[in-house]
């Protein structure tokens, strides 16, 4: 199937070396590789990246990275962030368009939870092939549990809140499948 390597916290050259090793090992056993280039703001895996330290993916570096790593999918930084947004994300669509046209390969949008629907649709129209929305799904789950506990604070039977929380995630997934134009596709 596939694996994801995130060396975006490294220098370009270090990220290339790390990603090359992962690609070589994965491709040897028929597994594709997604890699991240550029740094997203926010928090992921307990690593915090301040907005001032977030760096958009440089199109020239993207070309070098792909040429030297032979990665199968590239996650680029164009203004999204891991975790919940404090403001409204503004995506750099010109950067996305430039990178997609130059690389002509699957492009991934990490940190897309909370990005407005119009921006998601535009990103898809410009060639984004995969969109990560983990935070949005986690929030759908925990928001439902919070709602249930607010109504029934003494509830202790997890069967009474896990099922509804899962259904809330399911509804969010269905909504996103439709938004992404993925319904009916395998």
What do the PLM-derived regions correspond to, one by one?
Residues 106-117:
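Glycine-rich beta-to-alpha transition loops that act as phosphate-gripper elements at the mouths
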Residues 146-186:
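Extended, intrinsically disordered, low-complexity segments
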Residues 13, 110-111, 167:
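Residue-level marker of alpha-helix boundaries and capping positions
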Residues 58, 92, 105, 156-157, ...:
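Poly-acidic low-complexity segments
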Residues 1-103, 117, 121-133, 143-147, ...:
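Alpha/beta enzyme core
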């Amino acid at each position: 199937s596939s694996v994801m390597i995130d060396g975006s916290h490294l220098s370009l050259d270090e990220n290339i070396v790390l990603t090359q090793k992962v690609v070589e090992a994965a491709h040897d056993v028929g597994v594709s590789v997604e890699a991240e280039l550029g740094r997203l703001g926010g928090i992921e895996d307990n690593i915090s990246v301040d907005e001032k330290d977030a760096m958009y993916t440089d199109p020239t570096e993207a070309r070098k990275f792909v040429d030297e790593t032979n990665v199968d999918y590239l996650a680029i930084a164009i203004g999204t962030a891991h975790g919940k947004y404090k403001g409204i994300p503004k995506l750099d669509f010109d950067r996305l368009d430039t990178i997609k046209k130059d690389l002509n390969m699957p492009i991934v949008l990490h940190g897309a939870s909370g990005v407005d629907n119009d921006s998601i649709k535009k990103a898809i129209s410009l060639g984004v092939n995969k969109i990560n929305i983990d935070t949005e799904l986690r929030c759908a789950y925990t928001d439902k549990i919070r709602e249930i506990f607010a109504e029934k604070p003494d509830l202790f039977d997890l069967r009474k809140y896990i099922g509804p929380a899962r259904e809330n995630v399911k509804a969010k997934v269905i909504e996103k499948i439709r938004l992404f134009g993925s319904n009916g596709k395998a």
